[in-house]
């Protein structure tokens, strides 16, 4: 993602740490079940109280401690003194004709993040954000228009799932979030510990119980973290944002490739496959006359040949971003020709189905557009006050 930033000068000042903000309390969603039990015991309660609280949070999905009717007022006071439940505020909801829902949430420090709900044939899938902004350096992506401001806490990541589920709970239609993809704004493995805690929380059988095989984490290619992740024992799916079949091209569109070129990346991927015996999915965004030539498809087939039985390639239509107008979407004919080369080489691949094309579809676009409007409004208000003096 590029170095372009749309922040105004006042926003560039050093930000106050979240935990130093007056009145800040972390979300209780940030605790694992074992940590919640330990905390309850340390505060004079029996272990079963923590189990009751966990059930209120993840099975009954309450939004305040006061709704926990079998918890004493004294213990509720302790909870309120130390935690909040959901730290996010809903700013904008956009619903597409195809059922895709895009949410803009405000964090306790006023920063904005996006979350997307996609209706699939197999259920409801939520795409969560893990960082405010991104420093990875993909030149085609809306997420990196704002540099990374901070990591999200584990509680803030879990809270996205909980608010999306609340959206459907309030509608009363009984629909449940069944799948999660960690593919929103930010690089998940650059916020490794919080993402791992999030995964273990939503996968917990006593809580949301989202199956590991229904969870996918996407990385742009932090090779050392891929190896580390292989040893964590979490059986979730791994996706790698590849987007180019050779180092020269990949380095030109993804800055991370300069640190972890394809040789290092594929060494880590092979280690992951050998360690977990799990398939890896490669994401390949189709950029018109950039990475969509038939020879690029042949290079991609050759690159993945060694791990063909345990790999899969998603060809992704590009969602244009106004700030990156030097890129455009590959034509259907070019995508079809690229796909045909892969299939002739025996590659498992698919052209990804698009979602939410009639709303701010590209990752980071809703947030970026909202920030622009907020700044324009602030400038207009400041100008009006100045003229009124």
Curated annotation (Swiss-Prot):
Cell compartment(s), UniProt: Cytoplasm
EC number(s) from the headed UniProt entry: 2.1.1.192
GO cellular component: cytoplasm
Residue positions of the active site: 114 (proton acceptor), 363 (s-methylcysteine intermediate)
GO BP annotations listed: rRNA base methylation; tRNA methylation
Key words, A-Z: 4Fe-4S, Cytoplasm, Disulfide bond, Iron, Iron-sulfur, Metal-binding, Methyltransferase, rRNA processing, S-adenosyl-L-methionine, Transferase, tRNA processing
Bias-annotated ranges (Basic and acidic residues): 371-389
Cofactor or coenzyme needed: [4Fe-4S] cluster
Sequence segments annotated as region (Disordered): 370-389
Binding residues for [4Fe-4S] cluster: 134, 138, 141
Cofactor note: Binds 1 [4Fe-4S] cluster. The cluster is coordinated with 3 cysteines and an exchangeable S-adenosyl-L-methionine.
Residues involved in S-adenosyl-L-methionine binding: 186-187, 218, 241-243, 319
Top enzyme category: transferase
Occurrences of domain Radical SAM core (ranges): 120-358
Alphabetized GO MF terms: 4 iron, 4 sulfur cluster binding; metal ion binding; rRNA (adenine(2503)-C2-)-methyltransferase activity; rRNA binding; tRNA (adenine(37)-C2)-methyltransferase activity; tRNA binding
Record-linked InterPro entries: Aldolase_TIM, Methyltransferase_A, RlmN_N, RNA_MTrfase_RlmN, rRNA_lsu_MTrfase_RlmN/Cfr, rSAM
Disulfide bonding pattern of the chain: 127-363
Catalytic activity: adenosine(2503) in 23S rRNA + 2 reduced [2Fe-2S]-[ferredoxin] + 2 S-adenosyl-L-methionine = 2-methyladenosine(2503) in 23S rRNA + 5'-deoxyadenosine + L-methionine + 2 oxidized [2Fe-2S]-[ferredoxin] + S-adenosyl-L-homocysteine; adenosine(37) in tRNA + 2 reduced [2Fe-2S]-[ferredoxin] + 2 S-adenosyl-L-methionine = 2-methyladenosine(37) in tRNA + 5'-deoxyadenosine + L-methionine + 2 oxidized [2Fe-2S]-[ferredoxin] + S-adenosyl-L-homocysteine
Similarity comment: Belongs to the radical SAM superfamily. RlmN family.
PANTHER family: 23S RRNA METHYLTRANSFERASE (PTHR30544), RADICAL SAM CORE DOMAIN-CONTAINING PROTEIN (PTHR30544:SF5)
Function: Specifically methylates position 2 of adenine 2503 in 23S rRNA and position 2 of adenine 37 in tRNAs.
Remaining remarks: Reaction proceeds by a ping-pong mechanism involving intermediate methylation of a conserved cysteine residue.
Protein name (database record): Probable dual-specificity RNA methyltransferase RlmN
Annotated gene: rlmN
